[in-house]
Amino acid sequence: MKKYGKRVIGVILMVLAMVLTQIPMPVLEATSATADFERDGDTLIHYTGTASAVSVPAGIREIAPEAFADQNGITKVYIPSSVEKIGEGAFRNCTNLKEVSLSDGLITIESGAFAGCSSLSGFTLPKTLETIGAGVFSGDTALKSINIGKNRLFSYADGVLYDRDQAKLIEVMPGREAETLNMPTKVTDIERYAFWGQEHLKEVTLSPNLSEIPEYAFSNCINLQKVSIPYSVRKIAAKAFEDCKNLGNITIPPSVTTIHDTAFDGCDNLKIRAEDDSAAQIFEQEREKNQVVSAMLQDDVAVGNFYNKQDARYRETVQVPVIMMSIIRLMFPIWMFQNIMPMIRLPFWGRQESYTIRQL
């Protein structure tokens, strides 16, 4: 009987050992230590550790700008309820960060706080959050949607974060896969960087109550082809459509009275349609002239410095072939160069002479 009992126990132990070997054991992650954090009072200034899972120490009230920036080893972050503010770019370019756990108590997330976190695939807003800055998720290409949870100050629909009443469009999730977006008619304001880097977006219809297209709003939307601009829009700000390389024909209504010089930088295929004598028509004429000059002089212009003895200072100069200078004289008014190129050096027949713009 004793031998039989021993055999049974032996068999049980063997079976148990076999079962245990098939159960995957959890891999322990490297976690942060108190010494890994540089502090100034209740502000976390900088993280110096190498852990993959980071827990911000209790008692911290503010995470300073760029405190965790470029920390590619971090995969998880836990932020306690004591933290009220996450500073600008605090976790910028943490490219392997996949999970962020925020606690109720957080009030403010500043601009670009999680920008460039390309592995981040989920995010939940605390119910206490009151303010979220521009481009918080810019470049987070894995982020298709977020959860606003019990927060009553924000709303969310179709991959887009708005304020509570949808009067302000705050940000389109970078991983949103839809190719079109019809902006709600309630929208009167777009946050800077709201559409930045949207890879899938091809067509946008703006709200008929929108008054301005702000800085960098659609910058780097490389596949954007069509934008419908309503008569409510008065201003198109700097870099608003920068590097939208596939943006084709676009109609800008006469209601737009201000277009920044850089609004359409890098839009190689753009053709603006506008009414006669409108700000948009004037902008397009100047843009086309600049494109012609840029194409003509791209390989022939050299920029250097010229020392003017009369006022004893260096001035910026541009070396231009004589034939090109003749074309420029015919095409452009002199005032266009007064602030851009104070002196022009013209090489001809083996020697160079210097001329002021007024002498040309």
Regions found by a protein language model. Give the residues of each.
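N-terminal secretory signal peptides that target proteins for export/translocation
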Residues: 1-4
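Short, structured coil segments at secondary-structure junctions
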Residues: 286-288
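GGW-centered surface loops in extracellular recognition modules
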Residues: 35-46, 307
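Consensus positions within tandem repeat domains that build extended binding/scaffold surfaces
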Residues: 65-67, 87-90, 111-113, 134-136, ...
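Sec-dependent N-terminal signal peptides
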Residues: 6-18, 22
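Structural signature of tandem-repeat unit edges
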Residues: 7-9, 33-36, 48-62, 72-85, ...
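Sec-dependent signal peptide cleavage junction
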Residues: 20-35
